[in-house]
Structures are given as C-alpha cells and as structure tokens.
Amino acid sequence: MITRQGNSFLQISPASRRSIKEQREATIEVLKENNPYYLARKLVSLYFLGYHMIHIFPKENNRLTSDQREVIKDLVRRLLMGTEIIADSASGMTLQVLINLLDLSVDAAFKRMILIAKSMHADVMLALMENNIELAREVLKSDDEVDRFSFYIVRQLNIAIKNEYLLSEIGLQDSRSCLGYRLITKFAERIADHAVLIAKELIDSKRPVNLDTVKRITAMSNFALGVLDEACLSMFKQDYNSADKAIEKAREIDYLEKSIMNGLSNLRNMNDIYRVKIITENIRRVAEYSSDIAEIVLNMTVQQTLKKG
C-alpha cells in the first residue's frame, strides 16, 4: 500500500495496514510546587497536538503530589476521549491515547456533539417548566460530554492538517476545511455553554418562572434550535443556499425575545423580570452562534456559486 504524506513524501506499507500510526511520545517534568491545573493545561495541549503517549514524571527525585495525580485522572476521565492511564504511581504516570485516527470521523463527532447540546437545551427547558433542580444539575454534567467531543475534534484536525492524505479519511475535503471546522466546533461548545448558564440560573434562584412565560421561552428555544438544525444541515451538505437561509431565519430571534419581554408588563418583581431577560439572552445567543456556523459554511462553499468560465 502506497500512502501520500503531504506533498513531498510517499509511505509504503503492507496492504493489510489500514491506518497510519505515527507513535509520538512526550514527557512532562513536574516540580512539587507546580499547580495541578498547570499540568492539566499542558496535558490538554499535548493531546491537541496529537501525541499518543504522554509520560508525567517528577523532577529531582520528588514525587507527584496526590492533588496533581487526582487532577490528571479527573481530566482524563472527563475530557480526553480515547485516553487511558496505563501507569500510575507517585513516581510517575503514563497516558496512552488508544483511539485510532480513523475510528470516528470529524463529521460523526460533530453530529454527536450537536445532539448532546440540543438535548441539554431541551432538558433545561423542561427543568424550567417543572422547576426541576435535579434535572438542571444533569444539564451541567452533560457539558463535559460536549467538551470531550470538542477536544477530540481539535486533536483530529491538528493531526490531519499535517498530512493532507488523511483529510478525506476523517471526512474533510481539504486543509481549508480545518479552520472552518475548528471555528464551528467552538461555536457548538458555546451553544452548550448557554444551556449550562440557564441551568445555573435555575439552580441559584430555586424559584419557578411564571408558567405562561416559560411556554413562550420554550417556543423561543425551539426556534433557536431549529436555526441550529438548518445551519448544521447546510454544513453536512456543504450547501451555500441552505446556509444563507439559516442566517436569514436567525434574525427573527430578536422579535421573539422582544415579544417575551414586552409581555412581562404585569410582573411587579424586578428580579423575576431580570431572570427572564437572562434566560432569553442565552437563547438568543444560541440562534446567533447557529448563524455564525452558517456564516462559516458560506465561506467554505462560496466557490460553488461562482460561474465557471
């Protein structure tokens, strides 16, 4: 099997070999006084860069502190998809990324990410309707799953952009798509974050919102998620016209928000009005980020609209 690696190299490998595995290793040397979250940030950076094996060793014959080890284990469990701790002691830790580059395409990971984000918004609307604090807390937990897929996508893009042959293998057309997908992934993360903010507002206030108002808020949320669906569909289809329609539709969210706020004239409690304003602002941001996704699709597909001379 002959495989292209970039523009200047060919790799010859047995025909049975279906994937390219460049086993890259990195070592993090740790001082006892290093903040555990300093290590976590460095570990995430190495994961993004595509390393398969990451060793974490203490410097100067010291030991890893229990806090350092716990933060690393928590990070691996919650956010680093496909990563296992294969050695763990006070004298050092070794992490291995076991997931294959071709096991899960960028498109498939993004679809899963969007489904979770949409479920978070549906759940937080139900939590508002029922004043269900436990369900709101479940929304907070779901945010880690969105981040896991986001981290995975960034890792895949960083690996693929160094080897253009792999782009099509993970579901991308060309290297230009990598930047677009990176931005789109960030917007999807933000959409999930706004579900978290609504959930936190409910948890902190512990007071129900007027039922009629919640119904109108839910309708606004469903509209915003409809814009998200159209924007994502335009991305998967690489359809310029569909993306343009999603952007136009997103503009209607301002009318829905104003309609809800104008309907609060009978409320006397300013805290209740402020709560509704916070919730509707978060929903509006969902429509705006969905419009941003569609805008990226326009940039990625605009050449489709040009006349061929």
Model-derived regions, located:
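Cytosolic, long alpha-helical scaffolding segments
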Residues: M1-G309
